[in-house]
């Protein structure tokens, strides 16, 4: 039974005294399109090839399927309150819009700039990774050695073209890529199980007792990293056909779909390598472990196909986060946190094209800075920034859970039940709070350099403070703009 809201959805759009958009974005995205973009943001093939070995090696445990089961359970509980808020906050800002609705303008403004900083870090990390991966793929197939940054520039250009246009085009591209990715991984999973794996098909990696071995907190932490991107569903609210139904369904599909896919594939991979051998294999050859399974259980051609698809997987992830950042810039431009020109919809493409172009320019400029600084694209840029971004996303989820509790706690006229407004958000707040504590405690495992680790933590904190300062300045000097921040 669908429960109708007993009060009007919060309009988090621009205040009438601020510049407004000159066109509306088309509402042409259904459950499948939005879920595809969120699933692609999680980069399933990239996670299986690149993240799975890291989960195993840092945790020193073969219990990787259990890590993903736990992460899925926590995120599923979080999704209950997250999607409930989507019915009442008519805004494309997702995390920050919900935080603002529950915790106020100042905290919400801080969350907005914090989210932008987090996703910019993700974009930079992935852009550096795909450049190196492309260069490596070319040499693997007999081509010449080429600079990674040239390929990164090319991928950014493609992203800029797709992101500039109607988002339905991006959704179609991501949908095709995602289907192929999942199909390839499923083929390998089935081949491993059909051929009996390394030591026979067993459920030994599903033994709960393994959670007491090694460093399970690190395994859970990196499992969460593999889910980053699922939250993209709510960002596309303004382009969904029926957001009150589409957003919740797409979010649950993304979380449960990714979780089951990861858990099953993780189990199959432990069967393929062997429960007793997989920690050593992941530690000794993290980049080649899964590709080696494709060679052993399927064919050399499949191994080559996976190397190519790794590029499309990471690109799909980049395109998703580009679209997420674009919607953040668009919403923040409409509110006056960023220049108002970013809050304008293109009359030609019916998309926030100016915001999209700005995201591309910011990414390009920061990557030039990376080149000038002489940072290693994988060991430093990818590793450091992906680690910091993981922490940032989980912090946003903690604040969102708290905001859900406060938002519905203030409204006695909302009859949505204890589970969706209090119990589930409370459980999510507690469990995600523990995860944040574990991430900070083990941050040195993500960023080995203590100095760099502290710098990244300070940068994250600074991005939050920027938004807080903007809100305080608005309150003191521009009351109309401050009121426009109200969710």
Predicted regions and their residues:
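Membrane-interface "cap" regions at the ends of multi-pass membrane proteins
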Residues: 1-62, 76, 201-207, 473-487
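Helix-loop-helix junctions that connect adjacent transmembrane segments
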Residues: 20-24, 65, 141-147, 175-307
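Membrane-interface loop-to-helix entry segments
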Residues: 29, 148-196, 250-259, 392-395, ...
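A generic transmembrane alpha-helix motif of multi-pass inner-membrane proteins
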Residues: 51, 388-393, 419-487
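Hydrophobic transmembrane alpha-helices that form the core helical bundles
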Residues: 51, 76-156, 161, 314, ...
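Membrane-helix boundary/coupling elements in multi-pass transport proteins
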Residues: 91, 114-129, 232-239, 300-340, ...
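TM-loop-TM module centered on a large, flexible mid-protein loop between adjacent transmembrane helices
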Residues: 97-98, 104, 136-140, 256-321, ...
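C-terminal membrane-solvent junction of multi-pass transporters and transport-like membrane proteins
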Residues: 210, 342-346, 394-443
């Amino acid at each position: 039974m669908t429960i109708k809201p007993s009060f009007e959805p919060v309009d988090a759009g621009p205040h009438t005294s601020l510049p407004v958009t000159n066109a509306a974005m088309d509402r042409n995205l259904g459950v499948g399109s939005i879920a595809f973009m969120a699933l692609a943001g999680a980069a399933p093939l990239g996670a299986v090839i690149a993240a799975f070995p890291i989960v195993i090696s840092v945790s020193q445990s073969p219990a990787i399927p259990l890590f993903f089961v736990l992460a899925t359970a926590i995120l599923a509980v979080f999704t209950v309150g997250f999607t409930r808020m989507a019915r009442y906050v008519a805004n494309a800002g997702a995390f920050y819009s919900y935080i603002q609705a529950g915790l106020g303008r100042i905290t919400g403004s801080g969350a907005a700039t914090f989210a932008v900083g987090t996703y910019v870090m993700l974009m930079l990390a992935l852009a550096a990774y795909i450049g190196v991966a492309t260069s490596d793929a070319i040499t693997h197939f007999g081509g010449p050695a080429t600079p990674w940054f040239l390929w990164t520039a090319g991928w950014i250009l493609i992203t800029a073209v797709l992101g500039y246009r109607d988002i339905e085009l991006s959704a179609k591209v991501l949908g095709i890529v995602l289907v192929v990715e999942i199909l390839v991984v499923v083929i390998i999973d089935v081949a491993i199980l059909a051929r009996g794996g390394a030591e026979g098909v067993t459920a030994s990696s599903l033994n709960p007792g393994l959670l007491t071995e090694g460093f399970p907190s690190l395994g859970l932490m990196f499992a969460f990293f593999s889910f980053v991107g699922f939250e993209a569903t709510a960002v596309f609210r303004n382009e969904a056909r029926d957001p009150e139904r589409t957003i919740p369904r797409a979010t649950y599909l993304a979380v449960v779909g990714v979780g089951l896919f990861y858990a099953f594939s993780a189990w199959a991979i432990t069967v393929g390598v062997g429960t007793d051998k997989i920690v050593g294999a992941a530690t000794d050859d993290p980049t080649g472990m899964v590709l080696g399974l494709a060679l052993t259980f399927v064919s050399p051609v499949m191994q080559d196909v996976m190397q190519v698809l790794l590029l499309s997987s990471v690109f799909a992830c980049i395109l998703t986060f580009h679209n997420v950042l674009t919607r953040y810039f668009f919403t923040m431009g409409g509110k006056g946190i960023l220049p108002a020109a970013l809050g304008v919809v293109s009359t030609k493409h019916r998309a926030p094209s100016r915001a999209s172009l700005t995201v591309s320019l910011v990414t390009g400029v920061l990557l030039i800075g990376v080149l000038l600084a002489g940072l290693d694209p994988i060991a430093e840029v990818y590793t450091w920034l992906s680690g910091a971004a993981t922490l940032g996303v989980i912090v946003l989820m903690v604040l969102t859970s708290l905001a859900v509790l406060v938002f519905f706690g203030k409204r006695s006229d909302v009859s949505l039940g204890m589970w969706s407004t209090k119990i589930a958000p409370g459980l999510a707040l507690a469990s995600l709070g523990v995860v944040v504590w574990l991430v900070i405690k083990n941050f040195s495992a993500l960023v080995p350099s203590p100095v760099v680790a502290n710098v990244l933590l300070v940068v994250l904190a600074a991005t939050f403070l920027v938004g807080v300062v903007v809100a305080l300045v608005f309150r003191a000097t521009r009351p109309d703009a401050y009121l426009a921040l109200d969710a």
